[in-house]
Amino acid sequence: MEVILLEKIANLGNLGDKVNVKAGYGRNFLLPQGKATAATAENVAAFEARRAELEKLAAEKKASAEARAAQLAELEVTITATAGDEGKLFGSIGTHDIADALTASGVEVAKAEVRLPNGTIRQVGEYDVALHLHTDVEATVKVIVVAA
């Protein structure tokens, strides 16, 4: 299935690229989420008419993500959790908890933007957590987990 990308998608292409994808990926993910449109003759013409508007929108999203990354670079978040004698948490600190703590400290962060490659945090200590704010913008924030 051939589609026109309406935004940059990792490992696939940039805004305006005409790419071939598997039919299920196109029909079930790209088209419903508005990330692509089918590459018919009329859709190609409609896309070319809106190209400048879409590029401007993409640039605004990237600039917004870069501004948030600059705010997050100097941010340090402390999360309090109940823990045992040896620093092992009762439960864990996940992406939702980190996103809530960052939002409470003044920078809006969605749960899906938080990356924990080693899984949830289960020990007291300091952690560098990666944030994926945009396809081109990554940020790192220091999360300190202390026992309650």
From Swiss-Prot:
Organism superkingdom: Bacteria
GO biological process, one term: translation
InterPro entries: Ribosomal_bL9, Ribosomal_bL9/RNase_H1_N, Ribosomal_bL9_bac/chp, Ribosomal_bL9_C, Ribosomal_bL9_C_sf, Ribosomal_bL9_N, Ribosomal_bL9_N_sf
Keyword check for Ribosomal protein: yes
GO molecular function: rRNA binding; structural constituent of ribosome
One GO cellular component term: ribonucleoprotein complex
Matching Gene3D superfamilies: Ribosomal protein L9, C-terminal domain, Ribosomal protein L9, N-terminal domain
Keywords (A to Z) from UniProt: Ribonucleoprotein, Ribosomal protein, RNA-binding, rRNA-binding
NCBIfam families per UniProt: L9 (TIGR00158)
Function of the protein: Binds to the 23S rRNA.
Family (UniProt): Belongs to the bacterial ribosomal protein bL9 family.
Name recorded for this polypeptide: Large ribosomal subunit protein bL9
Top-level taxonomy: Bacteria, Pseudomonadati, Pseudomonadota, Gammaproteobacteria, Pseudomonadales
